[in-house]
Amino acid sequence: MLLAVGAIIAGLILLVWSADKFVDGAAAAAEHWGMPTLLIGMVIIGFGTSAPELAVSAIAAMEGNSGLALGNAYGSNITNIALIVGLTAIIAPITVHSQIIRKELPLLVGLTLIAGYQLIDGELSRTDGWVLLTVFAAVMGWFIFQGLRNKDDSIEAGIEESTLAHPMPLRNAVFWLIAGLVLLVASSRMLVWGAVYVAQSLGISDLVIGLTVVAVGTSLPELASALAAVRKNEHDLILGNILGSGIFNTLAVVGLAATINPLQVDPEVLYRDWSLMLALTVGLLLMGFGFAGRSRIISRLDGGILLLVYVAYTGFLLTTMIPATG
């Protein structure tokens, strides 16, 4: 138990440090390569930091643990929006000024609806998995096309200004881009191992582990990257990170797990967990678009509401599921 606790502490410390280096490398590399920074946020930061989710769900599927595989993916999406966006907005309100992000938000809502439709029959077959992976490949191509078309997006000017203030040679940028990502994944795996060991010692079910402990652990790279980005005032990089990760989890993580081994879907996954994931995604859409006379900003009040939802959901999971395992 002491070794597991030590892994959690060491993983957290290494995670925060490596995330800061990774964001620096990503922004500098984007400037050198002439790539839109939001594209870096979507593809490298958003998808790259989702590698822990991919690994955990793939291994869980190989072992026939559908609850852990799905709980990790959907729990990470819930954590990303409710906990990470909520906490980040409380620290500093997030301004939504990128035209690209206002396209990605409705896309994520649509993909979440597709995911829910696949859950209705109580199973995610290999065919369902291949459908998700095919859609993922198409979305990736669309991301790249849109990113290259929008080189003048306002986010790029802001990131160029910040990177020019602290120029980094391309060699150093690439080094920290790769090393930072490797350390992010390694430290998150260290943390998840410790957290899962502790949770299992307490007798918590696999589904709850996936939705809470594992989801939070594998989402910590997104949290660390978001906190580093808000410190640098790179607001669209924050949302690019979260949206990219959400799309990756919904399509690639679940899709790969289902192609490895068909996943059995418990009823509560659809009616409780997926429903909350959809509600949070729609809520983020409304905040990002600024409907009903609102400014396009995720305020501290919005962040507080998201964080409260996360605390209530996690508390509900623990109070309803832990007794059932005893």
Model-identified regions with their sequence ranges:
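Hydrophobic alpha-helical segments, chiefly the membrane-spanning helices
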Residues: 1-326
